[in-house]
Swiss-Prot record:
Mg(2+) binds at residues 235, 256. The lineage of its organism: Bacteria, Bacillati, Bacillota, Bacilli, Bacillales. One of its GO terms (biological process) is tRNA wobble uridine modification. It comes from Staphylococcus aureus (strain MSSA476). Pfam families: MMR_HSR1, MnmE_helical, TrmE_N. This is tRNA modification GTPase MnmE. The keyword Cytoplasm applies.
Length: 459
């Protein structure tokens, strides 16, 4: 594939120990040699070496930066192209100067995700692996990064390719049947083979889809909203679960003015914890904005931790709030058990019915273990599956697998009903195409461009 040479800063902007300018393409080494002065020309050094030298402005002869330059030659690189990585000091001005020089002498500024896109276009990775690269970068827990790494290593790709190969074998048998319609024994054997193989493929698709709910939680975190009246201990609960003092804990109602968010691993379950401003009527403009954001967070939650104050009797406000959340997945927490009990637990149970109830003291860190176990049990049936399993965690993949499952069921129904094989062939071909979209072999250029546009610059 004949592509130009691209360049970008591949480290976060800002001050730091190191900043890296990356080039990829057929002229990467040539462009770098125009700027680099060291013991040897970069064109003459072995691949996969790091070389000390300086970046010189060819026009002014000014020494721009002291650098270490990595030389990586095709095809054993991420993009399967020649790659140069110029390791600079991490100052903003200097690294931008080096970037500008690479563009002045022949490179083009890379688009977001273009390095990974080239890895895909050059056959280094498939589309599902490319998507997993971004999942890995964005992962907030160890479990999420492990699931993404498994996909980068090609575990999902291998399963999809295996099913596509099985479909090709069915299609080959169907072709024999179409070519020799006069032989009844061929038709019978084809139908039997088609049904047997199709049901196995459907079973494998179902197995993958069964991991979808957990996979999505692993990837995105279980969106968990802590809600309750002001000053019932919501921020203390957030701090205890994340074991940090991120939220301001005071005795003043309305202290949390915004939605606070934190990722935490709770007994193997990655939570995206959201501490909301207390939902109440208020004239404070800033607090009012926080309340509106709280309502939005509630509407998007997977789990709601509804907090009550042991030191106060239930109020109409508690009833009103619970009415808002009662049809969701809720755990009710009666907090501040270290204080005098003024709440009627039986009244609480009457209000919440069969909803799980936990009693805690965030001040004394009591009841937290029970709460964590309840969260795990509610979503994972008491057991979090092995993170080394192959999970389907991407919404696009889940949608395509559901389409494939329906289409293969259509093919099974058609074959069992005696529909002509050339009609069944249409469904089988469509399944092969749908599964190909997951790994990018049959994906449209528009889809590919859209997916890679979501990447960051330099990746």
């Amino acid at each position: 594939m004949d592509l130009d040479t691209i360049t970008s800063i591949s480290t976060p902007m800002g001050e730091g120990a190191i900043g890296i300018v990356r080039l990829s393409g057929p002229q990467a080494v040539e462009i770098a040699d125009k700027l680099y002065k060291g013991k040897h020309l970069l064109n003459d050094v072995p691949s996969h070496t790091i070389n000390y030298g300086h970046i010189i402005d060819p026009e002014s002869k000014e020494v721009v930066e002291e650098v270490m330059v990595s030389v990586l030659r095709a095809p054993k690189t991420f993009t399967r192209e020649d790659i140069i990585e110029i390791n600079c000091h991490g100052g903003i001005l200097t690294i931008n100067r080096v970037l500008e020089l690479t563009m002045t002498y022949g490179a083009r500024m890379a688009e977001p995700g273009e390095f990974t896109k080239r890895a895909f276009l050059n056959g280094r990775i498939d589309l599902s692996q490319a998507e997993a690269v971004m999942d890995f970068i964005r992962s907030k827990t160890d479990r999420a990064s492990k699931v993404a790494m498994n996909q980068i290593e090609g575990r999902l790709s291998d399963l999809i390719k295996k099913q596509r190969q099985s479909i090709l074998e069915i299609l080959a048998q169907v072709e024999v049947n179409i070519d020799y319609p006069e032989y009844d024994d061929v038709e019978d054997a084809t139908t039997e083979f088609l049904l047997e193989q199709s049901k196995e493929i459907k079973q494998e698709i179902n197995r993958l889809l069964d991991t979808g709910a957990q996979g999505k939680i692993m990837r995105e975190g279980l969106s968990t909203v802590i809600v309750g009246k002001p000053n019932v201990g919501k921020s203390s609960m957030l701090n205890n679960l994340i074991q940090d003092n991120k939220a301001i804990v005071t005795e003043v109602a309305g202290t949390t003015r915004d939605v606070l968010e934190e990722y935490v691993n709770v007994r193997g379950v990655p939570l995206r914890l959201v501490d909301t401003a207390g939902i109440r009527e208020t004239e404070d403009i800033v607090e009012k904005i926080g309340v509106e954001r709280s309502r939005k967070a509630l509407s998007q939650a997977d789990l709601i931790l509804f907090v009550l104050n042991n030191n106060e009797a239930l109020t109409q406000e508690d009833y009103t709030l619970y009415e808002v959340v009662k049809n969701e997945d809720v755990i009710v927490i009666v907090n501040k058990m270290d204080l005098e009990q003024n709440i009627d637990i039986n009244e609480v149970k009457d209000m919440i019915g069969d909803t799980p109830l936990i009693q805690t003291s965030m001040l004394k860190q009591e009841g937290i273990d029970e709460l964590e176990i309840q969260i795990r049990d509610l979503f994972f049936g008491g057991e979090v599956q092995n993170q080394d399993m192959t999970y389907v965690s991407n919404s696009r993949h889940i949608s395509l697998l559901k389409q494939a499952r329906q289409t293969i069921q259509d093919a099974i129904d058609a074959a069992e009903s005696g529909v002509p094989m050339d009609m069944v062939q249409i469904d089988l071909t469509r399944i092969w195409e749908i599964l190909g979209e997951i790994i990018g072999e049959t994906a449209s250029d528009e889809l590919i461009d859209q997916l890679f546009s979501q990447f960051c610059l330099g990746k």
